[in-house]
Regions:
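A short N-terminal helical cap/helix-turn-helix that marks the beginning
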Residues: 1-16, 32, 150
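Conserved pre-ATP/AMP-binding loop-to-beta segment of ANL
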Residues: 11-12, 58, 136-156, 160-161, ...
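Conserved AMP-binding/adenylate-forming core of the ANL superfamily
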Residues: 15-59, 67, 84-89
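Conserved structural elements of the adenylate-forming
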Residues: 31-36, 165-180
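Solvent-exposed alpha-helix faces
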Residues: 35-39, 93, 105, 160
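Structural core segment of the AMP-binding/adenylate-forming
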Residues: 43-44, 67, 71-136, 142-145
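Conserved S/T- and glycine-rich ATP-binding loop of Class I adenylate-forming
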Residues: 52, 69, 100, 155-158
Length: 180
């Protein structure tokens, strides 16, 4: 079921809880923060079919960011923190991400060569744009031009480098019912 619908029907119900119980988010929080993040992505000039990358460890904010991309008509590429710097660099370049969401602590531990056109948004501290600060002034309501997005995953690459798998996105607004 759509998180926005859960937000209306059971706003205070927990949507996600981390395995240690320290991170929790309700459906209302997920919906509102993903809406704010969607507006933020739009403010950066991202348009339908553009891409973002998410390089995070197990963090519930991944879900909020992924949902924001999903409701903004964007591709989102999850990148494992277990990858070597060369693999991360390759995926960032290949998926044509315009924004990278990560933590400064992850950047400090890796030796990434970030593409110059990439906007880095950190979820903790650091010189990059801070996610919490960046989204705080944006509305918690959905975007008027919401569209469906999708995850762009990478195969294991049996012939060498991993291959990005990008599905076509619908041209209609998000939530549009198709005639069959």
């Amino acid at each position: 079921m759509h998180p926005g619908l859960h937000s209306q029907l059971r706003p205070n119900k927990l949507a996600f809880v981390s395995d240690d119980g320290e991170q929790q988010t309700t459906y209302r929080q997920l919906d509102e923060q993903s809406n704010q993040t969607a507006h933020f992505l739009s403010s950066l000039g991202l348009k339908h079919r553009d891409g973002i990358a998410i390089l995070l460890d197990n963090d519930l904010r991944f879900l909020t960011i992924a949902w924001a991309a999903q409701r903004s008509g964007l591709y989102f590429t999850p990148i494992s923190t277990f990858f070597q710097a060369a693999e991360v660099n390759y995926i960032l370049e290949n998926c044509e991400a315009r924004v990278l969401f990560t933590k400064q602590s992850i950047l400090d531990q890796t030796n990434l060569t970030l593409p110059p056109q990439l906007t880095v948004v950190t979820l903790d501290r650091g010189p990059s744009l801070s996610w919490g600060t960046a989204i705080s002034d944006f509305p918690i309501t959905p975007q008027a031009d919401a569209r469906e997005g999708a995850e762009m995953i990478y195969s294991s690459g049996t012939t060498g480098l991993p291959k990005g798998v990008r599905f076509d996105l619908p041209l209609s607004p998000g939530g549009t019912v198709s005639d069959l």
